[in-house]
Structures are given as structure tokens and as C-alpha cells.
Regions:
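Short alpha-helix capping/helix-loop boundary micro-motifs
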Residues: 248-251
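Glycine/charge-rich catalytic "coupling/switch" loops of P-loop NTPases
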Residues: 178-230, 256-291
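C-terminal boundary and immediately downstream tail of ABC-type ATPase nucleotide-binding domains
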Residues: 151-175, 204, 268
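Active-site beta-strand termini and strand-to-loop segments that position acidic
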Residues: 240-242
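A generic structural motif
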Residues: 173, 230-232
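ABC ATPase nucleotide-binding domains
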Residues: 2-6, 10-157
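Short aromatic-glycine-enriched beta-strand elements
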Residues: 235-238
Length: 291
């Protein structure tokens, strides 16, 4: 309270026996505020969070999204300068998560507070984060503006954490002006990769940069075994085996494929990152530098 820090958790923390109005008012009552000040603050906060029509209802009469907005209102009403949100959308169904993802940036802007938002979903970080810190095994691996962290991951762990599905990796050897991926796929070394010392690297590329057709003349072709497909409607997740590596491709459209079938997939070298033997970024994907 004295530090003006508030927290919102994955579980909806509301008093079930109190109305939405009284839930929002409860922190101010504990602070000993006057009733007129409480009423003004509650109604302003309820308006910001679009809870005004629900003020006389109790939490169990609300949808999951409304309950979470009520919990957020309780955090914001006391004028906290720092609000910590610990996976606040994790317990909501898909539709409610999508609705609140649209609402939360507006709430951030209207409140004027600093928000620290913890999530395991890269998509949420990209949608909601002005700055992003990526964590791996309790250690911050990178911090910076969200688009920059996504496009220019400092190391392979950051690239893995900040990709959904996780970034795909394959061993790559650089010899003179040529890159060899795995045992059979080749591409010329361009841009930042051309200036790297010869040696062994780890190449990384995201799921959405795998295609089923050759779209560019220098696209790298990989022969893979289909492990499974997941068709979501407008997109298909293709799970692939490439030697001992396990990859996931995300391709547009419906592409049913038989498990165990052999197939070729393609990756544009412009979307390939190279990491050194310590996992540090050695050469960013050329597209990332052009963005």
C-alpha cells in the first residue's frame, strides 16, 4: 500500500459476497478514505473498465472477463503507480481472452500506471508489451523494446522463448561463402553471415517461415518426415522430423498430410538466424535488419 504497488493474479481475487461496487471500494475503505472520495474513485474506475452497468451485481453473476476486470479495478482504484499482472488471462476461455487483449491496452493508456505483465505467450507480449524482458530458468536473457527483442533475439534461448511455436534449429556449417544446413541443404552466405568466420553454427528459423513450396530461387530445401498435422481452419501446424531435429511449420490454408510421409519444406535464407557455439546471436536474419 505505502509503495503504491498493486497485483492482479491468474485467479480472480474478488469477494464473492460483495457487489462489484463494494469490491472496488474495499481497498479505499481499508485506507480510511471518506465516502465521497470512495464513491468518486469507484465510479471513475468502473467507467474506465466498462463495469458501470455491473456495479450492483456480485462476482458470480459476471462472466470470467468481467470478473477479471473487477479484480483489475480493485488494483487500479487506489492509484497504484505500479501494477503487477501475473498471467491475468490464463483462466479465461479463448473468446474472453481475445476480448480482454483488445481492452487491456486501452486500460493501460487510461490509467497512467506502469504495468508489469507476466505471460508465457509470446503473442500476448507482442500485443501488449511496450518493452519485454524474456526469462529462462530464472534469468533475464534480454530486455528491450518488444519488436526489437522479437526481431533481434540476443541468443538462442531468447529466440526459443519468444517464438510460438518455439524457433526451429538445425546445425549449420559456414565455409567460405557457402552455408550447409544439416547434411544436404546449401545456401550462399549473404549479408552479415558472409562476414562470419568459417565454422559450425546453429541456424534458427520460426515456424511461419517454413513453406511447402519454393517461393524464392535460393530457398533452402529440407527433406523431412511428417510427424503430425494440426489444422486450425485457416492455418495448419505441420510437425516435422529432420534427422534428430523436431520442427514445427505454420502454413496458411488447410494442408492435411499423412503421418510418416516424406515431404520437402523450404526456408528463405532471409529468415535464418545464426547462433554461435555459446548460443549467442552471430548473425541476425536479413529480414530483421530490413524491418
Amino acid at each position: 500500500q505505502d509503495r503504491k504497488v498493486a497485483m492482479v493474479y491468474q485467479q480472480f481475487i474478488n469477494y464473492p459476497g460483495l457487489t462489484v461496487y463494494e469490491n472496488i471500494a474495499s481497498p479505499l475503505r481499508l485506507m480510511g478514505k471518506a465516502q465521497a472520495e470512495i464513491d468518486k474513485a469507484v465510479r471513475q474506475t468502473a467507467e474506465m473498465l466498462r463495469l458501470t452497468p455491473m456495479l450492483t451485481r456480485k462476482p458470480l453473476e459476471l462472466s470470467g472477463g468481467q470478473q477479471q476486470r473487477c479484480a483489475l479495478a480493485r488494483a487500479l482504484v487506489k492509484g497504484a503507480g505500479l501494477v503487477l499482472l501475473d498471467e491475468p488471462l490464463a483462466n479465461l476461455d479463448y473468446k474472453l481472452r481475445e476480448e480482454l487483449r483488445i481492452e487491456i491496452p486501452r486500460i493501460f493508456e487510461a490509467s497512467g500506471a506502469i504495468f508489469v505483465y507476466a505471460t508465457t505467450e509470446p503473442e500476448e507480449a507482442l500485443l501488449l508489451g511496450g518493452n519485454t524482458a524474456t526469462l529462462w530458468e530464472g534469468r533475464v536473457t534480454q530486455f528491450g523494446p518488444t519488436p526489437q527483442v522479437y526481431r533481434l533475439p540476443a541468443d538462442a534461448q531468447t529466440a526459443r522463448v519468444f517464438s510460438d511455436p518455439p524457433m526451429n534449429f538445425v546445425t549449420c556449417r559456414k565455409e567460405s561463402h557457402r552455408l550447409t544446413f544439416g547434411e544436404e541443404a546449401h545456401a550462399p552466405a549473404h549479408g552479415a553471415t558472409a562476414g562470419l568466420p568459417d565454422g559450425t553454427y546453429t541456424a534458427g528459423f520460426r515456424a511461419n517461415h517454413i513453406t511447402l513450396n519454393r517461393h524464392t530461387g535460393d530457398a533452402v530445401e529440407f527433406r523431412c518426415t511428417v510427424a503430425a498435422t494440426e489444422i486450425t481452419g485457416s492455418e495448419t501446424f505441420v510437425h516435422l522430423s529432420h534427422g534428430s531435429d523436431r520442427w514445427v511449420g505454420l502454413v496458411h490454408g488447410v494442408h492435411p498430410m499423412t503421418a510418416g510421409a516424406q515431404t520437402s519444406v523450404f526456408v528463405d535464407p532471409a529468415h535464418v538466424y545464426l547462433f554461435d557455439s555459446a548460443g549467442r546471436l552471430a548473425a541476425p536474419a536479413p529480414y530483421a535488419m530490413a524491418a
